[in-house]
Curated annotation (Swiss-Prot):
This is Homoserine O-acetyltransferase. Residues 55-354 form the AB hydrolase-1 domain. GO terms for cellular component: cytoplasm. It is found in: Cytoplasm. GO terms for biological process: homoserine metabolic process; methionine biosynthetic process. GO terms for molecular function: homoserine O-acetyltransferase activity. Keywords: Acyltransferase, Amino-acid biosynthesis, Cytoplasm, Methionine biosynthesis, Transferase. Pfam families: Abhydrolase_1 (PF00561). Belongs to the AB hydrolase superfamily. MetX family. The keyword Isomerase does not apply. Substrate binds at residues 220, 349. It comes from Corynebacterium urealyticum (strain ATCC 43042 / DSM 7109). Pathway: Amino-acid biosynthesis; L-methionine biosynthesis via de novo pathway; O-acetyl-L-homoserine from L-homoserine: step 1/1.
Length: 388
């Protein structure tokens, strides 16, 4: 491992990974990924265990996430937390195509100007390929486990099929074997709204200094409803008016809102302030292209051929990736460790909200993964059970 390239614990480094060739045949030259690393000292220890002596946990973030996993998954990642940064070397990189430090549409193009509309379409496999190149640069031949939820879960599954020899076990959370027609439909509706913003300019708005933030906010309103639970949203807001407003007047007026509209307005504003529309379109399109079965004989064959021990986790009220999709993974995975259900009214976002349940699942998974790493025979046995 090139410890000299690792950022100090809790910080990031931008690591050049060279050219990335996409699954569809496009080239992204001079690419770099922003990598966060966490390897703290234990509370009693005077000095931390050096990172090169630790098992590696690779975390994959969701659509609008970034590499700072100790921030967006604060209950899970840290000293003494389920993913213990005093025990593991925890790595998390901003995805290719993102806008939190890695090369994406808002990055400068090597030939001048911004990438913008010149940035190619990406698949989930392309995001994994870029991360593989990152690990190659760091001279990390394998990791202990890979854990990811939502888009991160899609990358986790692709990692296990593209480079099965590089990990002991994986935990994909709240994801499916491929994008469903419903997901593609609602996600492409979000893309259309951004493209309909007059400031989109075909993706080339970076020079203008003003971007399609209206469209991005509207896309987030749609998306956010798919991240929550239907009953939870109704319980919180019902058909109540926004405080001091009247949505039942003589004429409909955009400043006379229902309470839930005010909530979605706040969610839209939060994302507008921290995310780029070009990255939103690129990564949402990558989710539309998610299909483990492509060029592998279909998704059930692809799952059946998986040789990486896999624990699956889902949320009972998930609208975006319904629990039956995790059950489907479980039935078909070649090397299956178990299926855990998080019970929550909050839907897809449950993996971020239900800290106690999520922590239990992670701890159970990491104990199992450690046993597998120590006892290769056990892994062989699991494989045998499934491939008889």
């Amino acid at each position: 491992m090139r410890s000299d390239l690792l950022p100090a614990s809790g910080t990031y480094a931008d690591i050049p990974i060279g050219e990335v060739l996409t699954e569809a045949g496009a080239s992204i030259p001079e690419t770099s990924l922003r990598l966060y690393a966490f390897y703290d000292a234990a509370e009693q220890a005077a000095v931390p265990t050096p990172p090169e002596e630790r098992p590696i946990v690779l975390i994959e973030h969701a659509l609008t996430g970034d590499g700072n996993a100790a921030d967006w998954w604060a209950d899970m990642v840290g000293v003494g937390k389920p993913i213990d940064t005093a025990k593991y070397l925890v790595l998390c990189a901003n995805a290719l195509g993102g806008c939190a430090g890695s090369t994406g549409p808002s990055s400068l193009h090597p030939e001048g100007g911004f990438w913008g509309s010149r940035f190619p379409g990406l698949s989930i496999r392309d995001l994994v390929q870029a991360e593989k190149q990152l690990l190659d640069v760091l001279e990390i031949p394998r990791v202990h486990v890979i854990i990811g939820a939502s888009m991160g879960g899609a990358r986790t599954l692709e990692w296990s099929l593209l480079y099965p020899e590089m990990m002991d076990a994986i935990l994909p959370i709240a994801v499916s074997a491929r994008a469903s027609a419903w997901q593609i439909g609602i996600q492409s509706a979000q893309i259309r709204v951004i493209e309909a913003d007059p400031l989109w300019h075909g993706g080339d708005y970076y020079e203008a200094g003003m971007g399609p933030v209206w469209g991005l906010g509207e896309a987030r309103r749609i998306a956010h409803l798919t991240y929550r639970g239907e009953l939870e949203v109704d319980e919180r807001f019902g058909a109540e008016p926004q405080q001091g407003e009247n949505p039942l007047g003589k004429f409909r007026s955009p400043d006379q809102r229902f309470s839930v509209e005010g909530y979605l307005d706040r969610q839209a504003m939060k994302l507008r302030n921290r995310f780029d529309a070009g990255s939103y379109v690129t990564l949402t399109d990558a989710l539309n292209r998610h299909d483990l079965g492509r060029d592998r004989g279909g998704m059930n064959a692809a799952l059946g051929n998986s040789t990486v021990p896999t624990m699956v986790c889902g949320i009972d009220t998930d609208i975006l990736y319904p629990y039956h999709q995790q059950e489907h993974l479980s039935r078909n995975l070649g090397t299956f460790l178990g299926l855990s259900q998080i019970t929550s009214p909050t839907g897809h976002d449950g993996f971020l909200i239900e800290a106690r349940q999520m922590g239990n699942v992670l701890e159970k998974f990491l104990v199992t993964a450690e046993k597998l790493a120590k006892d290769p025979e056990q892994r062989a046995n699991i494989l045998q059970q499934h491939h008889h």
